[in-house]
Amino acid sequence: MVTVEEVRKAQRAEGPATILAIGTATPANCILQSEYPDYYFRITNSEHKTELKEKFKRMCGKSMIRKRYMHLTEEILKENPNLCAYEAPSLDARQDMVVVEVPKLGKEAATKAIKEWGQPKSEITHVVFCTTSGVDMPGADYQLTKLLGLRPSVKRLMMYQQGCFAGGTVLRVAKDLAENNKGARVLVVCSEITAVTFRGPNDTHLDSLVAQALFGDGSAALIIGADPIPEIEKPIFELVSAAQTILPDSDGAIDGHLREVGLTFHLLKDVPGLISKNIEKSLVEAFKPLGISDWNSLFWITHPGGPAILDQVESKLGLKPEKLRATRHVLGEYGNMSSACVLFILDEMRRKCAEDGVKTTGEGLEWGVLFGFGPGLTVETVVLHSVGI
């Protein structure tokens, strides 16, 4: 007769959870940030709000975003005028859209990740799906399983309404799944579509206008597993540790509420200041066990939020400008894609490292950090270990 401890030992993987493949996808519709204010005020029938339009132009100009991708085309918005009003009942139309499009965009990214991984999809044991765009039962995890033709016995976890920190959350959850289930291969998908948050401008709610200037659509997928099969699976990054915390004195700093008018978004406090003031504590807790205290010795992947957050974090920690290159690049090319952002940045970093011929996937460095920030204010901190290229 075996003991419970013997069973547990046999169930556990030996090595750390490892990212084995990354895939990304966006809708085809690309919008240039320089042209967006004119388009946005025209499509929402708000061109008479000239002062507000000038304010929005300044927001877009300071955003450091060059372009974004959006499922919502001009044709779709003309067919759904309530989406263009500031607070018209429109939840049904938004839901009808996203419950179909979120899994579809997730499938695109997942298909790319599975192709890079190179193993049969029947080897996928777990699915972790994350979106802040809409809610449904059965969820986007179920729809993705059907779209990809995964085994009906695949173990699914659906994460709705987490917000911008959740790119870190999915890594933390996948790490625990991979390390506690020997042979597990976890498909992680973050898929976000702004159809739930798009609305016309309003003079008294500038935080809603900030969201219109920053958010874009995108989906990213990873394959995560421990103990990669030599010569068959190719490690990209190892997940060494993961933590989550709520920042002090940050209640109500970022709020999102699902209402008849869609998902409303509120920024109520100095979010960049709160994050930059508290970030070092998370770094110290994560890296003290490794004996690391030089933040410039790490490679950096951080949820971009907006340029003010990046500027204040960079200043507070004394980071060299090149530390946030990959993060700023993704913000510029895609905008803020909520939970998917940090996974896009992982992909950008490993791609650029291979292109430049540096010795590791982490810009030639061994250790790195991934940060997710979002409602709460909640911070996810993931310690990464690069692999040789």
UniProtKB/Swiss-Prot annotation:
Location(s) in or outside the cell: Cytoplasm
Tissue expression: Highly expressed in glandular trichomes (lupulin glands) of maturating cones, to a lower extent, in petioles, flowers and stem apexes of flowering plants, and, at low levels, in roots and leaf blades.
Record's catalysed reaction(s): (E)-4-coumaroyl-CoA + 3 malonyl-CoA + 3 H(+) = 2',4,4',6'-tetrahydroxychalcone + 3 CO2 + 4 CoA; 3-methylbutanoyl-CoA + 3 malonyl-CoA + 3 H(+) = phlorisovalerophenone + 3 CO2 + 4 CoA
Activity regulation comment: Stimulated by CHIL2 but inhibited by CHIL1.
Pathway recorded for this protein: Secondary metabolite biosynthesis; flavonoid biosynthesis
Residues at the active site: C164
Name listed for the protein in its UniProt record: Chalcone synthase H1
